[in-house]
């Protein structure tokens, strides 16, 4: 996998870690050989990264104690958007930032492309779920709405809402 032309092509995006993504793809393909279904594979891979995610969750919970936690999340989103547009790893239909809300729709994603080339597009949900994991750990300040993602839909449409500013 790491010697393939596709790996070389995907390594050109600095905002993605192709080595890490390809390792996850290899794990998924290996688990597929045991006739596991997608949800079992996703659970197994996520369980393998549990220690790393626990640290990340703790950090997010600390951030959620800050009065400006939404602004921190907003800066992450804007920074991530700018990096990914610059390197071409994501193609946005739109990315709107307004007072207390970010809404975007992603039409093309290099992560999806990497998984799709191995016939396991649906397993890219492992990476799509990182947003959900992030925002569910900011419950005091952020409401995250995922309308769709690219692992099983035609776009990734998300809303990140400041709970203190917008009442729904």
List each model region and its residues.
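C-terminal edge-of-domain segments
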Residues: 154-163
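Terminal "cap-and-tail" regions of soluble proteins that handle hydrophobic small molecules
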Residues: 18-21, 166-168
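Amphipathic interaction/junction segments at domain boundaries or subunit interfaces
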Residues: 19-25, 29-118
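Short, hydrophobic/π-rich interface segment
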Residues: 91-145, 149-151
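Short, charged/polar, Gly/Pro-enriched secondary-structure boundary elements
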Residues: 111-114, 164-168
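Short, charged/polar micro-motifs that form catalytic or ligand-binding hotspots
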Residues: 9-17, 121-125
């Amino acid at each position: 996998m790491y010697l393939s032309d596709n790996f070389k092509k995907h390594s050109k995006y600095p905002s993605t870690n192709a080595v890490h993504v390809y390792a996850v793809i290899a794990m998924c393909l290996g688990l597929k050989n045991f006739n596991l279904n997608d949800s079992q594979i996703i659970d197994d891979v996520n369980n393998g990264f549990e220690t790393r995610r626990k640290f990340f969750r703790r950090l997010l919970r600390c951030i959620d104690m800050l009065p400006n936690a939404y602004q921190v999340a907003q800066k992450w989103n804007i920074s991530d958007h700018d990096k990914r547009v610059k390197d071409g790893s994501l193609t946005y239909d739109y990315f709107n930032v307004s007072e207390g809300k970010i809404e975007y729709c992603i039409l093309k994603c290099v992560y999806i492309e990497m998984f799709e080339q191995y016939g396991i597009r649906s397993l890219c949900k492992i990476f799509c779920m990182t947003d959900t994991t992030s925002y569910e750990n900011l419950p005091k300040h952020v409401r995250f709405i995922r309308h769709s993602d690219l692992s099983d839909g035609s776009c990734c449409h998300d809303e990140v809402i400041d709970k203190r500013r917008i009442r729904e």
